[in-house]
A protein has these predicted regions:
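Single conserved hydrophobic/aromatic residue that forms the stacking wall/gate
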Residues: 1-8, 12
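Active-site regions of metal-assisted phosphoester/phosphodiester hydrolases
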Residues: 13-215
Length: 215
């Protein structure tokens, strides 16, 4: 059972994993439940690891606790991956990563973009992108961008208060990501964002995202 008042991650799967890990080695009693790792044995005898995380939002650059906590979580996830895997392994890191990787992932309007940067609001601050870049440069591919390198009008999060999903053009951010190790690049077939589910009654402010791998 998940406590809906706190951060949490979950994984739904068709194949039973061989091993499930909850939490990072660096977690303590105060750490929210943000990390799940499932390891699968595939029919071709290869091993696939899927890590699902809910990365902290971070509030803003000046926040005394939330912003450092976001940085620490990114560092801890990177260190875990770096210690446990190599880029040639079959590894997926996915979830609400709370960072828009490139400017084409920002769809809140130019004035709002400038204001967020000026106010130090999180989601695409330069230092945040450095945290994410460290992971991708290790050997992870943004699967959506691999298939849609130039798209600038598809987003995964839309603010309820400003009714960003209902506006035309839609106003949102692409902050939910599926990263795959370079060892999975050749098996990645397509990727997208599901607006149909976001259009349902009482939806989440986030859209489902997906990537198809043929392994």
């Amino acid at each position: 059972t998940l406590d809906r008042s706190s951060a949490a991650s979950d994984v739904y799967k068709r194949q039973q994993p061989e091993e499930v890990t909850f939490g990072l080695p660096t977690d303590d009693a105060q750490t929210q439940r943000r990390f799940i790792e499932c390891k699968f044995n595939l029919l071709n005898q290869r091993n696939l690891s899927v890590i699902n995380c809910y990365f902290p939002q971070g509030s803003d650059r000046k926040h005394a606790t939330k912003f450092p906590a976001k940085k620490k979580f990114y560092v801890d996830v990177f260190n875990y991956i770096d210690n446990q895997y190599v880029p040639g392994d079959l590894l997926i890191l996915m979830g609400d990563m709370n960072i828009a990787p490139v400017d084409n992932d920002i769809g809140i309007g130019e004035e709002n973009r400038k204001r967020w940067l000026r106010d130090g609001k999180t989601s695409f601050l330069p230092e945040e992108r450095e945290w994410l870049d460290r992971i991708t440069k290790w050997g992870m591919t943004d699967s959506f961008r691999a298939h849609h390198p130039d798209i600038d009008d598809l987003f995964s999060w839309f603010d309820y208060r400003s009714r960003g999903f209902e506006r035309s053009p839609k106003r949102g951010l692409r902050i939910d990501l599926i990263l795959n190790s370079t060892g999975l690049d050749e098996f990645s077939k397509d990727s997208g964002i599901d607006y149909e589910v976001r259009s349902m009654e009482r939806p989440s402010d986030h859209c489902p995202i997906w990537t198809e791998f043929d392994v």
